[in-house]
């Protein structure tokens, strides 16, 4: 018999899971998400979260509490009489009373192979650290930071070509399927939980804009990982002088390339930039106030001569 669920999520990453659960016949009693934020032109309109948009399209009641710590919030949560809650990038801490409210517990989809990369930015940090693989896990939540017992996991290799955006989209799709499988097992009474290992714990700190500047004095593979791990947001950037003007360019994609030179120096007309060892060839970038563009299109309108310095 399908489960009666509360779904709790906010960004695009959570949308595939909501759609898959609804599509597999589970009853979504309510969707909890963050409140709309000012946006649009001049920031005058209130913009709903991606999850709120999808929930309303599906006709599911939406709840946007400022906190879950009040007795009023707990009473409202309990009133849904859910079998379980599914939590995907909700963005708010769930107190123990909320975790205890659904009959079968609360289950979180986390975008890493726990206990590695607990915390806010597991996708970015996995790429930036040069991990060979990552994945998604379904865990039964406790009050700790991503410390709950693991129910299911799916692994995914990380290639040199993957950006955080690429990995985000793949893990969102894989994770949606994984959560559907987990809820099916929970429904049958056959969901097995395994404690996380004590060894190998790392934390994925929130990405700060201050760390986005590219350090060309690092090896080429580290520069590539930095660029791809921060693409598209906040976007790894570097400054260069074009037509006598200092310009900040976000570099969104690159590839390892042969070549040597002073770190930060352009070494050919294909926008290949030297690093401490080796080089990277820029394949996609973004100028301030402009949209992303292929490097080839950028070079058709802007001459970037060998010897030009990025820094």
Swiss-Prot record:
The keyword Transcription does not apply. The gene is fmt. One of its GO terms (molecular function) is methionyl-tRNA formyltransferase activity. Its EC number is 2.1.2.9. HAMAP family: Formyl_trans. It catalyses: L-methionyl-tRNA(fMet) + (6R)-10-formyltetrahydrofolate = N-formyl-L-methionyl-tRNA(fMet) + (6S)-5,6,7,8-tetrahydrofolate + H(+). It is an enzyme of class 2 (transferase). It holds the Pfam family Formyl_trans_N. Belongs to the Fmt family. Attaches a formyl group to the free amino group of methionyl-tRNA(fMet). The formyl group appears to play a dual role in the initiator identity of N-formylmethionyl-tRNA by promoting its recognition by IF2 and preventing the misappropriation of this tRNA by the elongation apparatus. One of its GO terms (cellular component) is cytosol. Keywords: Protein biosynthesis, Transferase. This is Methionyl-tRNA formyltransferase. Signal peptide: none annotated. (6S)-5,6,7,8-tetrahydrofolate binds at residues 112-115.
